[in-house]
């Protein structure tokens, strides 16, 4: 099997996705080519060009929402139920002129936390950041848990970072979805009162620091 895959996002200066997929292809015995496709401003023409060259691709920041706007009215567009409900997509599969759209973040996050908890119920969860990943996590856990989001621009659905002090002692799971620690924010740190999280069971960082 020969597959040409890629990752679409910006800036993609220090992503490990090509290396990870190279190793995965070797492990599975698949002849797999995986390329970085750095695009700052995504539009329909660029998506058409990508679709003509690849068998599938991942979408990362800042395009997980934008991609849906650009392909949802295209013939052959087939989103999974998570993409339909959330409007957030991180994986495209191209087969026989059909565009299959998936949100695999949901399964990845769920499996990671279920390696710690058998069931994630009745937990107080605080999510740092209010982007696409934050909405995915809220969607995943809000039915059986208390989920709050901290945002630099708080609204009716989120709190400000200054309010974290008030709820920190009650939080069981803290999840960072901000780009802090990732390019180009490697030298920045989360300005939150870690010493106030007296009952914290898990700190889950969705990003990775290249130095680590």
Model-found features: residue ranges?
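Phosphate/diphosphate ligand-binding glycine-rich loop within oxidoreductases
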Residues: 2-115
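Glycine-rich adenosine-cofactor-binding loop
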Residues: 9, 101-106, 113-143, 151
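Residues in the short beta-alpha loop(s) of Rossmann-like NAD(P)-binding domains
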Residues: 11, 153-155, 209
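Short glycine-rich anion-binding loops that position phosphate/pyrophosphate groups of nucleotides
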Residues: 56-66, 133, 179-182, 208-209
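A short helix->loop->beta-strand "cap" motif at the edges of active sites that frequently abuts
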Residues: 94-95, 144-146, 198-201
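NAD(P)-binding Rossmann-fold cofactor-contacting core
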Residues: 143-160
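Rossmann-like adenosine-cofactor binding region
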Residues: 157-212
